[in-house]
Amino acid sequence: MAYIQLEPLNEGFLSRISGLLLCRWTCRHCCQKCYESSCCQSSEDEVEILGPFPAQTPPWLMASRSSDKDGDSVHTASEVPLTPRTNSPDGRRSSSDTSKSTYSLTRRISSLESRRPSSPLIDIKPIEFGVLSAKKEPIQPSVLRRTYNPDDYFRKFEPHLYSLDSNSDDVDSLTDEEILSKYQLGMLHFSTQYDLLHNHLTVRVIEARDLPPPISHDGSRQDMAHSNPYVKICLLPDQKNSKQTGVKRKTQKPVFEERYTFEIPFLEAQRRTLLLTVVDFDKFSRHCVIGKVSVPLCEVDLVKGGHWWKALIPSSQNEVELGELLLSLNYLPSAGRLNVDVIRAKQLLQTDVSQGSDPFVKIQLVHGLKLVKTKKTSFLRGTIDPFYNESFSFKVPQEELENASLVFTVFGHNMKSSNDFIGRIVIGQYSSGPSETNHWRRMLNTHRTAVEQWHSLRSRAECDRVSPASLEVT
């Protein structure tokens, strides 16, 4: 088969068509040869294809055509170079040849022995999804840890440090005989009965026995005199609305036989705990807690009622409440008057063993650290829950109001000696506590309106420690 060298045309459209056909024919045969070489050769070859024509015919192209020629041919395609004709006398290429660029292709063919020669294979890497910056790390077996046991955590706590009463856990597991033998505080006899018709609970305090003898003031030896016991009754968690029996003089086996009624719905009563506290009123007018008895009312039949003998256990409350006082304050800016109403008191400490208390209230106005005025209520005989409903008025200009303090002191009237101190509070510039401060601020914010509030009485020492106004009065 003869290879015909065509002379490129230099004129117009025909010249472009000829060059395009020659390039297309050459590229088709080049691609076919490259494919055959990739399937048959095991070594790496470099094939260079030059174009466009006129150019020297590659050797492998001439070898593929030699199989169609006769064996008598003298020259091979590789020995007969094809040279293009030129019209210029100096043998240079025409302007159409120089305007065409020369293409060069270099292909490195790798060994494909393992592939089938009949069809080409495309080597595609598997697609991996994930964060590009993440690094693969081999999974290591985790270190076995000790099995967690919740009990190990709670063993670190000491429950008795968080208990309100350190003896409560021990007492629950003991009988009344064991409690009496362990603490030796005596026993208390009482009963309960709920009235569904009137919705009230009746608590009857009957008697006590085997109460311990009182301790002397310094605590070093026992006082040979007998105790002066009484009982306080309340329904926890409400300790404000408590009841109190009379004081029984010089006895370790007091008989009370007193009844007290609590107005409370039946369902609410079942959620309460009955607390009875036995207190000793000694000859130094001190109130010392002997012991207590607590009964959850959900564990008893309130409607049917019942009687109990219960052993007394130690109480964490060594000091009893001093009582409460209900006051009303009102300031009139136009008149410059500070009005005070002493309404009532409840559950005051007894100051006389035989007659109870004859309480009265002293009101003292202090401006800065100077006592200005003193007034007092009348005293009521033989009661610890007095009703006064008495009003007092003090002249306080508005510019001096912020420096004013009111000192309220409850005394037990004593005709034979000085009056017995029961409790005190301070309201105003030098208030004795948060409750008193709140009452004073409410009055300042609501002029011409009476503001009522209950206050728990404090000891003289506590008031003197926190309020300078308390130090200025007697």
Curated annotation (Swiss-Prot):
The keyword Membrane applies. Residues 96-112 have a biased composition (Low complexity). Expressed abundantly in brain (frontal and temporal lobes, hippocampus, hypothalamus, amygdala, substantia nigra, and pituitary), kidney, and prostate. Expressed in fetal brain, kidney and lung. Expressed in melanocytes. It comes from the Eukaryota. Residues 184-310, 321-455 form the C2 domain. Residues 60-112 are annotated as: Disordered. It is a peripheral membrane protein. It is found in: Membrane. GO terms for biological process: cell differentiation; positive regulation of dendrite extension; regulation of calcium ion-dependent exocytosis; regulation of postsynaptic neurotransmitter receptor internalization; vesicle-mediated transport. GO terms for cellular component: exocytic vesicle; glutamatergic synapse; plasma membrane; postsynapse; trans-Golgi network. InterPro entries: C2_dom, C2_domain_sf, Synaptotagmin, Synaptotagmin-15/17_C2A, Syt17_C2B. The modification Phosphoserine is found at S118, S119. SUPFAM superfamilies: C2 domain (Calcium/lipid-binding domain, CaLB). Signal peptide: none annotated. Pfam families: C2. GO terms for molecular function: calcium ion sensor activity; calcium-dependent phospholipid binding; SNARE binding. Transmembrane segments: none annotated. Keywords: Differentiation, Membrane, Phosphoprotein, Repeat. Belongs to the synaptotagmin family. Plays a role in dendrite formation by melanocytes. This is Synaptotagmin-17. The gene is SYT17.
